Amino acid sequence: MKVLWVAVVVALLAGCQADMEGELGPEEPLTTQQPRGKDSQPWEQALGRFWDYLRWVQTLSDQVQEELLNTQVIQELTALMEETMKEVKAYKEELEGQLGPMAQETQARVSKELQAAQARLGSDMEDLRNRLAQYRSEVQAMLGQSTEELRARMASHLRKLRKRLLRDADDLKKRLAVYQAGASEGAERSLSAVRERFGPLVEQGQSRAATLSTLAGQPLLERAEAWRQKLHGRLEEVGVRAQDRLDKIRQQLEEVHAKVEEQGNQMRLQAEAFQARLRSWFEPLVEDMQRQWAGLVEKVQLALRPSPTSPPSENH
């Protein structure tokens, strides 16, 4: 079966070599073909090299299939998705615990914004994981198709697979940037709401302290000032803690962004390397067979061409 599979791939590449060259971009590197001497080899040696190529590719076919069926990328993205959603949930619960006793309206607004961001992030990362699983299933299905279907779909499938991987990586990159901006904006609005709500209370405290100072004297004024400073200190503490959490979630989003972008680059490089490997395996064989066949046809034509008849010599 392996020898038959390799023979099918050789015939496929010989038939759609021109299509593959047109669909691959200029950025994809190709393995340089080893130079050959000017003296052409006999066609028997060319046939021997053909079987040598088949045996060589047969030893590599299992490795190629293992690379195509590898699920390490999907597993790493799954773990990364779970870790990210866990951190978002922990931040949401901590922020609700800090703002709950002070401002229920602010707590409800922040909770709603964080739930929406959490749902969008989880949905998009789950979509990316499902797409990667779909790519793997399509590759497995492609390897099981008949010779005619495989020959018709090979060139376009490789190009579409590469474009989809690049498009999904770029889409996820843009969405993460939107989430980062949304988280920053939501946290800033929450801090502003806290200041707006407690600002009048501080002013009322100052006004009451001034009024009571005229009635009860200096000791009561000092107590009111101490209460105002204590309340102001608590407000500043809440603001600092919320800002720290905002910085932490920004850093986590940047790390997630970097990891996902790295995974996208790795998938793109793997696809390009696999395409280059296929071409480097079979292009030298196809070119060598075409050259040897042309030489054989030329030799046969020369052998079948009638030789000119020499004139008879006269004896004197």
From Swiss-Prot:
The modification Methionine sulfoxide is found at M142. It holds the Pfam family Apolipoprotein. The modification Phosphoserine is found at S146. Its main location: secreted. Residues 79-254 are annotated as: 8 X 22 AA approximate tandem repeats. One of its GO terms (molecular function) is antioxidant activity. Heparin binds at L161, R162, K163, R164, R228, Q229, K230, L231, H232, G233, R234, L235. The keyword Repeat applies. The keyword Phosphoprotein applies. APOE exists as multiple glycosylated and sialylated glycoforms within cells and in plasma. The extent of glycosylation and sialylation are tissue and context specific. Glycated in plasma VLDL. Residues 209-289 are annotated as: Lipid-binding and lipoprotein association. Residues 1-18 form the signal peptide. Keywords: Chylomicron, Endosome, Extracellular matrix, Glycoprotein, HDL, Heparin-binding, Lipid transport, Lipid-binding, Oxidation, Phosphoprotein, Repeat, Secreted, Signal, Transport, VLDL. Glycans are attached at T211. Residues 265-316 are annotated as: Homooligomerization. Sequence repeats lie at residues 79-100, 101-122, 123-144, 145-166, 167-188, 189-210, 211-232, 233-254. GO terms for biological process: AMPA glutamate receptor clustering; amyloid precursor protein metabolic process; artery morphogenesis; cellular response to lipoprotein particle stimulus; cholesterol catabolic process; cholesterol efflux; cholesterol homeostasis; chylomicron remnant clearance. InterPro entries: ApoA_E (IPR000074), Apolipoprotein_A1/A4/E (IPR050163). GO terms for cellular component: chylomicron remnant; endoplasmic reticulum; extracellular exosome; extracellular matrix; extracellular space; glutamatergic synapse; Golgi apparatus; high-density lipoprotein particle. It comes from the Eukaryota. Residues 277-289 are annotated as: Specificity for association with VLDL. Homotetramer. May interact with ABCA1; functionally associated with ABCA1 in the biogenesis of HDLs. May interact with APP/A4 amyloid-beta peptide; the interaction is extremely stable in vitro but its physiological significance is unclear. May interact with MAPT. May interact with MAP2. In the cerebrospinal fluid, interacts with secreted SORL1. Interacts with PMEL; this allows the loading of PMEL luminal fragment on ILVs to induce fibril nucleation. Belongs to the apolipoprotein A1/A4/E family. APOE is an apolipoprotein, a protein associating with lipid particles, that mainly functions in lipoprotein-mediated lipid transport between organs via the plasma and interstitial fluids. APOE is a core component of plasma lipoproteins and is involved in their production, conversion and clearance. Apolipoproteins are amphipathic molecules that interact both with lipids of the lipoprotein particle core and the aqueous environment of the plasma. PANTHER family: APOLIPOPROTEIN, APOLIPOPROTEIN E. This is Apolipoprotein E. The gene is APOE.
